[in-house]
């Protein structure tokens, strides 16, 4: 509690300090504008006509009153006459002409006291002020606005585009430590000596060693690269400059290089310190071949960064940490020793790492006694740190939605299903024909997945619409897969076609829907890579036939070259077709031999809508009684499975919109679940979930 009060008071004092500074700046600006307004009003008033005392009377009345002996005194001030009457009233009139001698004679003859006022001569100071004030005023206004535009006093003005946007955080502002970072022990070990150097540089210097001037954190999104950089700064207790790679380049030429110079100048003044550049691939992308002409502002920014990091002048005490998930596109000059001496890979966590990450995020969540982080970690292969944080948060939201005080294992299961398979769309109404067709489709995926060798176990099958999917077959690996065998990949090809084949066997070739479009796309991609990249074709051999997919703006080449002849490309297409046909026929034979299981699984899906691994085990064992899923129902705990045959298969006639299905199938590849290494193959060759929708 004391720590919370201290933090709150610190926050309150910080807010009060910021508020006081803001009010002080506002008061200064207000006073300045008031002074300018008063001076301008004084000047305009001095040049404008002055107000005269008394009322104004026409000259004719004045002459007539002289003859009537009503005037006692007349005071002349150039053409203005102030008249005092004998009844002690006064008024003002003006001479129509100068030097009216007759008027003076009439006034003297009428015994009127005549007074003259000498002309007012301005003082020397007033003359100088009147002469120079307009120019001084213009200069002052120009200086004021230039200071405002340039962000005078540390502000962000319109002319401050050449200044660095890096935010400096002092050691007191960074509370993150290595205790808050879990699941990347090797990466923490790599950067701990950096912290030791910042704490005690002499220990390294007396042995002639130099600390790396730059560290590049490499890894997939969500693995904690930015968090690790903050932990380094929090442990080292040094100033920490943070900036994004996209903050350097803007609309003006030369801004990026100017900001790089300004950032390193600020860092040198605060040395020893850390500069953290997030998403450095935005500015550090490999320099191109100059196609298209013109001036590449990003390249000039990169050149300036190369010079600042290791150029003619050293940056003693300034350590640059950068993070990226695209190290392949960075310029080689940026990655050489002397700039980024060390590359630290922050990969996806393994089972133990996921358990540690879950424990970190569960600190702030009240948990039921049945929650086991180790079980959750084993059931979430391929999850990054950000995914696990989202999992804990979703579980807490499920518990709050149910007005619970603690989060149980049930909420974590619901959260995992939502993340891996999508949110349930309970409001969507499907016809019985659509549900039945979807059930057969998903049953085909599940049966093939259970019967082919070296395939990930089937975790759950559902015909509840989730996200943009109408049906889901989820595979969950038993362990983290570092690489994939040929047997596993061919089993994936067979299981991907299981849904289409189930529809074909039940409804006939003419009634097959477009729901398998994404299955076909993914299977074709896997087969093509097996032939052209991974050497799994005896005819083509272990040769790389992949096309050059690098663009010129990523550097290295101006034109793309063709790596194969037309005959070779034709042979590759034939090998891909043969590979797919072989596994397609294998899947057909498996389903044809297990039609009774497919009908039983369809009936279970129609009743329960979602079945798990335990029910699938009962179905595959052809048991007469099938266990109900967890949390199911009030009435029957078991369902009597009625034996059905292919003759009794319904003749469901369903039409579907290809556009809707194609859009829905995009969602099937969002969560690969069998990947924990940088050497892993792309999404298509990982063990993915099968949320392919036969109907839309």
From Swiss-Prot:
SUPFAM superfamilies: FtsH protease domain-like (SSF140990), P-loop containing nucleoside triphosphate hydrolases (SSF52540). It is a multi-pass membrane protein. One of its GO terms (molecular function) is zinc ion binding. It comes from the Bacteria. Keywords: ATP-binding, Cell inner membrane, Cell membrane, Hydrolase, Membrane, Metal-binding, Metalloprotease, Nucleotide-binding, Protease, Transmembrane, Transmembrane helix, Zinc. The chain crosses the membrane at residues 30-50, 125-145. Residues 627-696 are annotated as: Disordered. GO terms for cellular component: plasma membrane. Signal peptide: none annotated. The active site is at 442. Its cofactor is Zn(2+). Coiled coil: none annotated. Its EC number is 3.4.24.-. Residues 1-29, 146-696 are cytoplasmic. Zn(2+) binds at residues 441, 445, 519. It is found in: Cell inner membrane. Binds 1 zinc ion per subunit. It is an enzyme of class 3 (hydrolase). Residues 650-696 have a biased composition (Basic and acidic residues). Homohexamer. This is ATP-dependent zinc metalloprotease FtsH. The lineage of its organism: Bacteria, Pseudomonadati, Pseudomonadota, Gammaproteobacteria, Vibrionales. The gene is ftsH.
């Amino acid at each position: 509690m004391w720590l919370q009060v201290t933090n709150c008071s610190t926050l309150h004092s910080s807010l009060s300090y910021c508020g006081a500074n803001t009010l002080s700046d506002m008061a200064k600006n207000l006073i300045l504008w008031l002074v300018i307004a008063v001076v301008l009003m004084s000047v305009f008033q001095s040049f404008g006509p002055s107000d005269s005392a008394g009322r104004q009377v026409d000259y004719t009345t004045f002459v007539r009153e002289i003859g009537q002996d009503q005037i006692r005194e007349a005071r002349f001030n150039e053409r203005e006459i102030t008249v005092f009457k004998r009844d002690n009233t006064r008024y003002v009139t003006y001479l129509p002409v100068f030097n009216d001698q007759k008027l003076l004679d009439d006034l003297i003859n009428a015994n009127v006291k005549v007074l003259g006022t000498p002309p007012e001569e301005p003082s020397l100071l007033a003359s100088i002020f009147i002469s120079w004030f307009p120019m001084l005023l213009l200069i002052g206004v120009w200086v004021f606005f230039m200071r405002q535009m340039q962000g005078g006093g540390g502000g962000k003005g319109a002319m401050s585009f050449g200044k660095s946007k890096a935010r400096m955080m002092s050691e007191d502002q960074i509370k993150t430590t290595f205790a808050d970072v879990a699941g990347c022990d090797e990466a923490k070990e790599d950067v701990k000596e950096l912290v030791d150097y910042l704490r005690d540089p002499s220990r390294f210097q007396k042995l002639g060693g130099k600390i790396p001037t730059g560290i590049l954190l490499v890894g997939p999104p969500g693995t904690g690269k930015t968090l690790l950089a903050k932990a380094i700064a929090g442990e080292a207790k040094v100033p920490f400059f943070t900036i994004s790679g996209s903050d350097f380049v803007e609309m003006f030429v030369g801004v990026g290089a100017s900001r790089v110079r300004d950032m390193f100048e600020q860092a040198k003044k605060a040395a020893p310190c850390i500069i953290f550049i997030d998403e450095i691939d935005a500015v550090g992308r490999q320099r191109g071949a100059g196609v298209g002409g013109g001036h590449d502002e990003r390249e000039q920014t990169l050149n300036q960064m190369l010079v600042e990091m290791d150029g003619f002048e050293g940056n003693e005490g300034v350590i640059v940490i950068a993070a990226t998930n695209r190290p392949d596109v960075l310029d080689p000059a940026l990655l050489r020793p002397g700039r980024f001496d060390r590359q630290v890979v922050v990969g996806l966590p393994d089972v133990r790492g996921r358990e540690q990450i879950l424990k970190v995020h569960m600190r702030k969540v009240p948990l039921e006694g049945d929650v086991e982080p180790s079980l959750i970690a084993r059931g979430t292969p391929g999850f990054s740190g950000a995914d696990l944080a989202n999992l804990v948060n979703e579980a807490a939201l499920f518990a709050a939605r149910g007005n619970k005080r603690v989060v149980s294992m049930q909420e974590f299961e619901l959260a995992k299903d939502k993340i891996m398979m999508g949110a349930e769309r309970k409001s969507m109404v499907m016809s019985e024909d659509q549900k039945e067709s979807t059930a057969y489709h998903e049953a085909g995926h599940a049966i093939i997945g259970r019967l082919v060798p070296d395939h990930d176990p089937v975790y759950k099958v559902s015909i509840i619409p989730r996200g943009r999917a109408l049906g889901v077959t989820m595979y969950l690996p038993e362990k983290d897969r570092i690489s994939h065998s040929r047997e596993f990949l061919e089993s994936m090809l067979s299981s991907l076609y299981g849904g289409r084949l189930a529809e074909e066997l039940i409804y006939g070739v003419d009634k097959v829907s477009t729901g398998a479009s994404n299955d076909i796309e993914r299977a074709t991609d896997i087969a093509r890579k097996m032939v052209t990249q991974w050497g799994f074709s005896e005819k083509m051999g272990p040769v790389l036939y992949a096309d050059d997919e690098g663009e010129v703006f990523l550097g290295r080449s101006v034109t793309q070259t063709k790596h194969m002849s037309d005959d070779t490309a034709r042979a590759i297409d034939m090998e891909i077709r043969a590979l797919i046909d072989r596994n397609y026929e294998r899947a057909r034979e498996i389903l044809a031999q297990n039609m009774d299981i497919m009908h039983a699984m369809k009936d279970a899906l129609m009743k329960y809508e979602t079945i798990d691994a335990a029910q699938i085990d009962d179905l595959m064992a052809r048991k007469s009684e099938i266990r109900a899923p967890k949390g199911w129902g009030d009435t029957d705990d078991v369902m009597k499975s009625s034996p059905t045959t292919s003759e009794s298969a319904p003749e469901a006639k369903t039409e579907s919109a290809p556009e809707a299905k194609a859009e829905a199938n995009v969602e099937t590849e969002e969560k690969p679940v069998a990947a924990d290494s940088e050497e892993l193959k792309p999404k298509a060759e990982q063990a993915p979930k099968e949320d392919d929708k036969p109907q839309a």
